[in-house]
Regions:
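An N-terminal, well-structured beta->alpha segment
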Residues: 1-64
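C-terminal catalytic subdomain
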Residues: 256-322
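Glycine/threonine-rich beta-strand-loop-alpha-helix active-site module
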Residues: 74-179
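Short glycine/serine/threonine-rich phosphate/pyrophosphate-binding segments
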Residues: 18-21, 43-46, 73-76, 99-103, ...
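C-terminal charged capping/lid subdomain of soluble metabolic enzymes
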Residues: 299, 309-382
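Carboxylate- and glycine-rich phosphate/diphosphate-binding segment that chelates Mg2+/Mn2+
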Residues: 150-256
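N-terminal small/polar loop signature for handling phosphorylated ligands or for N-terminal nucleophile
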Residues: 42-115, 229-239
């Protein structure tokens, strides 16, 4: 079977990349932008860097800011109504995964109104038309939602997150400018950075991995390992390296899937509103230990990309253990907790395990699992 890789039509990378937004919109004849960004980014002037460019060009726009850190069905429905009221014809989404996931769902429903029930988009969505033309501008180095064919929505009523997979939702243009990430606080930088590392590692060991995705993921692991500590300290080199590393990770995992770490993390965010990156970072070492018996021989390449000393002289078991230790060390260095104490409630484990097993990311895990085994993994994280 042939491998399929879906990416943005155009992407811009590097300092000053945002200067290309208005020219791209005007060249295509668009008349009014729907700016999708959250209140904090507006408050701290990050969104203003883009709206200032639109103002300078006298390009009309409307701002939608009703976005939660774990976007809900209601956020999407309100956004669809706001887009229609604004009479916009394109989307510029500015933010992390929450803003971009919200924008993706809005854009899909506007052009595919038969999917107005957001829940109907879960899984591999059978939409017929591409979403509204979108330019995505990430302000975090982690989710890579600007280059993925996935988005995640929280169902508050059912206390779960669901993943939507749709090649029609990928933004036509990604603008990855490290200057847009410089205002991220340390904690958010660490959490989103570890999310990016989880994308790269899970994508590398997933059942669906292929030669092209392997190339992307190993380079992403290298860039993230070399630059996350610096990015947390807000060094220009660290920010630039992470901006590129997280994007390359997205180029890979979007096309081949993830695994049990993400399936377990989604439930924590839905039930407790735990930041997704923090949940992934805490669970990642446990997931690697769990998958070691099936995918451990692939850990050597991960460890090598992370710069583990002497890994070529180790046997497979030693290399796998050294790789897991390197992941734990990086996580500790950027201040991520080592367990779910204070987050996870024992009485919720059955529900969370069932949700994780049903999650769209779970089938890609290299080791076949069960609700009972996932329950034990959660218990081990208390």
């Amino acid at each position: 079977m042939a491998d399929r890789i879906v990416l943005n039509t155009i992407s811009y990378h590097g300092h000053g990349a945002i200067e290309n937004i208005v020219p791209e919109l005007t060249a295509r004849g668009y008349k009014k932008a729907f700016v999708c960004s959250d209140l904090d980014l507006i408050k701290f002037g990050v969104t203003g860097k883009i709206t200032a460019l639109l103002d300078a060009a006298s390009f009309p726009y409307a701002v939608y800011s009703e976005i939660k850190p774990n976007p809900t069905i209601q956020n999407v429905q309100d956004g669809v109504a706001a887009f229609k009221a604004a009479e916009a014809d394109c989307i510029v989404t500015i933010g992390g995964g929450s803003s971009m996931d919200t924008a993706k769902a809005i854009g899909i429903i506007i052009n595919n109104p038969e999917f107005a029930d957001v829940r109907s988009l879960e899984g591999v969505a059978p939409t017929k038309k591409h979403a509204v033309f979108t330019i995505a501008v990430p302000t975090t180095a982690g989710t890579a939602a600007e280059v993925t064919i996935n988005y995640v929505i929280t169902d508050v009523e059912k206390k779960r997150k669901f993943v939507c997979v749709d090649t029609n939702d990928i933004p036509e243009i990604a603008v990855v400018d490290p200057d847009m990430m410089s205002s991220m606080p340390k904690g958010l930088t660490a959490a989103t950075g570890m999310d990016a590392l989880t994308h790269a590692i899970e994508g590398y060991i997933t059942k669906g991995h292929c030669t092209i995705s392997d190339m992307f993921h190993l380079e992403a692991i290298k860039l993230i390992s070399e630059n996350l500590r610096g990015a947390v300290q807000n060094t220009p080199e660290g920010r630039e390296g992470m901006a590129l590393g997280q994007y390359i990770a997205g180029m890979g995992f979007s096309n081949v899937g993830l695994g049990i770490v993400h399936s377990m993390a989604h439930g924590l965010s839905a039930l407790y509103d735990t930041p997704h990156g923090v949940a992934c970072a805490i669970i990642l070492p446990t997931g690697l230990e769990y998958n070691k018996s099936v995918a451990g021989e692939r850990y050597r390449a991960v460890g090598k990309a992370m710069g583990v000393t002497g890994i070529d002289e180790m046997n497979d078991a030693e290399a796998a253990d050294a790789t897991i230790a390197a992941v734990k060390q990086l996580s500790a260095d950027v201040g991520i907790p080592t367990n779910l104490h204070g987050i996870l409630k024992e009485e919720d484990i059955q529900f969370l395990a069932e949700s994780a097993f049903a999650d769209a990311c779970c089938p890609g895990n290299p080791r076949d699992t069960s609700v009972e085994e996932i329950k034990e993994l959660y218990k081990g994280l208390l």
